[in-house]
Amino acid sequence: MYLGHIREVVTFLTGQYPGLRLLLWDDMLRKIPAQVIRESGITQHAAPVLWFYTPDLDTEQIGKIITKYAESGFSTVWFASAFKGTTGPAQMWTPLNHHLKNHLSWLKVIQAMAKFPTIQYQGIVLTGWQRYDHYSVLCELLPVGIPSLALCLQTLVNGGFTDTTKKRILELLGFQNIHLEQSTCEGTGSFPGSEIYHMVERVNVQLKEKALKVLEEESAIEGWFSRYHRRHRFGNPRNLESFGSKLIKTFEDWESFLQGFRTRLEAVFFPDTVEEWLEENVNVQLEPLRELVHDYREVIQLNGRPKSR
């Protein structure tokens, strides 16, 4: 059924556009015997795109797949790597070393293609997933993945990751240094979207930590402004004031930051994308803090009124 569908599509498109060669992501092809693929007639006008996104590729397994495609009658093969998006459906921050290793592994495969004389390597597609499918949440935003894209592209162009490669990457991005294991970059950056890159970094590194620190490490909140106190709208003003200024400052600092962050996002993304990303990555952390501040402001005005029923 699959090959029949592909044959119909190939026949139609090559009839409309003579000389066109179609690229087929090879998921479905891997389980189909070489002879069946050959007899389908699709190999004359199509090429498989062999994709793996893990850091350490099984080159022996990939070699077997390439051999099978050569036996199937394909004259060319493409590969597909990833510079972002494949490390988790809700990933916020791109792990640089993971994607660098993926490309270094693909370089080994590319450099070994002489072992397959009947099938020619055509190129590699660097994928940058935005979602895992139409129903999943957003993974890394493109500005967050641009340093990884530069890293992976330059590694492919230069045939490896060397000091010279690193220097070129830093020049392109406008950074002073790049830390692969920590997935961080030093400097302001000069690439389009660098402001968003740094703002997302702040959300990723600081928001959850700062919000939790206020909510969980402040014993006065636990002792004198628990959920029970908040539900019944009472509290001792003296105890509330011991943490109130810190609570409000933390909240207002983040609210001020997020106003500017939203403006930056809206200059690049559609409104629904902005709303979704903030809902998934910011509000989930900030909402408990926002609710606590709201309750604090209401209860402190009651000036020690006894517990409501």
PLM regions and their residue ranges:
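Substrate-binding groove of N-acetylhexosamine-processing glycoside hydrolases
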Residues: 3-309
